[in-house]
Amino acid sequence: MSVQLPAHVREEIDRWVAKFPPDRKRSSVISALHAAQHENDGFLTTDLMDAVAAYLGLAPIHVYEVATFYSMFETKPVGRHHVSVCTNISCMLRGSQEVVDHVERKLGIKTGESTPDGRIYLKREEECLAACTGAPMMMVDHVFHENLTPESIDKILDELT
């Protein structure tokens, strides 16, 4: 089955391609995959990866390698809202495991799972989200939430619809 990228996704990819030399379209593959994943409810299918490869003139294997290497890409259906808890050393020393435990209890799921209603996906361990000064922290739909407490976590999660 052949999938076509919607016009607005192709336009977004074109904006990224324009940032690189003409012979370096490959440099825009991460941004292209982000655009395709966002369009498809937060995950990539093989058909979507093939469409990105075709649009960029790349071998499909190159796109698959990128999509399966980086933790920011999902290759199976997941919840609408993506929650990532940083577990690197700075966050760990400031209570990230307690944050993970609290989120798992509150949502009734483990890392790598989505809530039964498909509302929230708790990503597997994130090695570093580059916000060490605000540890412990988590990212929800690409927005950083720092200096977390059980109360602030509950408020953040309760506001997700």
Region spans (language model):
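Signature of N-terminal electron-transfer/Fe-S-associated modules in redox systems
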Residues: M1-T161
